[in-house]
């Protein structure tokens, strides 16, 4: 059976509950969030590949599940954030270009057990993966008929990566194709720094974002 988005979301929910019930003894004492994330993501990919026809990503494809255009992110409840590859400044406004599946865990260790309690599992459609504050500001400006110079001014004010040509091209695209409201917090760095606190707490109130909470 071919893996689809609907199946992915249901499997992510079931996997979260299964993962929370297991003893992950190999992670006892591990504090490196990247190691925990890799562990969870590989388990989930294996869980899916046993049941469905799918493509597993590589460093070349850049995302974990290219056949459903989805990247998997695993992050601690203490500070739900991760990094995403920077491709262009327009990702901050129009989205990353792929869906995100986010597992948020609370890790608890004893001498003999490690529990990964999945507190939140959130699926975010690609067009909701832009930055919250800049898309809100742009949508507000467009609602009162802002012009190209107004938009370029906002891009400067918000320190969007790029030069005058980038800003001019972005402003033209924003006027021609107003962005959807995004729900991530995206900070500029060599890679995008993405924070998930807002999106994991939407409680299924926004189209394009599916939330499970335990």
Model-inferred region functions:
Residues 70:
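Acidic/His-rich structured neighborhood in mature extracellular/periplasmic domains
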Residues 1-66, 74-214:
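Nucleic-acid endonuclease domains
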């Amino acid at each position: 059976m071919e893996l689809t988005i609907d199946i992915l979301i249901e499997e992510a929910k079931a996997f979260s509950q299964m993962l929370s019930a297991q003893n992950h003894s190999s992670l006892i004492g591990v504090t490196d969030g990247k190691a925990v994330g890799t562990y969870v993501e590989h388990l989930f990919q294996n869980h899916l590949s046993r049941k469905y026809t799918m493509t597993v990503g590589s460093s070349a494809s850049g995302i974990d599940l290219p056949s459903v255009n989805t990247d998997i992110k695993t992050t601690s409840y203490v500070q739900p954030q991760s990094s995403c590859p920077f491709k262009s400044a327009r990702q901050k406004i129009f989205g990353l270009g792929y869906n995100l599946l986010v597992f948020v865990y609370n890790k608890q260790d004893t001498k003999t057990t490690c529990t990964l309690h999945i507190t939140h599992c959130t699926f975010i459609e690609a067009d909701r993966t832009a930055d919250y504050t800049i898309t809100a500001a742009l949508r507000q400006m467009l609602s009162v008929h802002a012009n190209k110079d107004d938009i370029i001014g906002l891009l400067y004010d918000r320190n969007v990566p790029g030069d005058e040509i980038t800003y001019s091209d972005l402003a033209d695209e924003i006027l021609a194709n107003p962005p959807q409201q995004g729900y991530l917090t995206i900070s500029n760095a060599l890679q995008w720094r993405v924070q998930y606190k807002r999106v994991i707490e939407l409680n299924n109130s926004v189209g394009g974002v599916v939330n499970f909470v335990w």
